[in-house]
Amino acid sequence: MTSRIAWNSILPALLAITTISVAASTTPPKPEDTGAAAQYRQLNATADPGAAPAGTYKLDPHHTSVIAKLAHMDLSRYTLRFDDVSGSFDFNPSGASASNVEINIDPKSVDTGDRAFDKRIASKFFEAEKYPTINFTADSVKIMNGHASVAGILNFHGVKKTVVLHTTYRGFAQSRMGFSGEATFKRSDFGVSEWVPLEADDVTILVETEFTRL
């Protein structure tokens, strides 16, 4: 009888210890404060334009997209992408007038997902054989509170006009500077009136890009 009473006293304690041990072994460990998480914080620490060093930056085509959108019969926004984009950015954080940007686009690289239609757009819409480059240049870039209005000259279809690119500064990290940009203009101002009004006259350009410091 004495041994039975002792066992009844010990058994609940053993069960409690076993339960705690199992729970502890199945609890996932907390991730260490290293690797991607630490690197991410380091990247975000340089969101101030003043922290980016002056110099010449080259557009990274692998981290750049230029997309054009225009309404089709007011039913949807038809989307064009350009696959061949190059450019450079001379940056001076202490003087906006000393900063400038240039972007070049090959109109033959237009991509709608339909190669036959791409060729038609390049020839009839852009007249790419006659005008082989779409060029945007600006000699004054001023970033304030993460945003900038970059007024530059768009050379498109043989016509040069001022276009404002509204940009958001994404930050500087590991020799890279990132921007998002948007501009809207009338293509008829540049002599491109093919398919108006079936295809809208207003064109919106969306740019996502990174520049790498040389």
Q: How would you name each of these model-derived features?
A:
Residues 10-21:
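Bacterial N-terminal signal peptides
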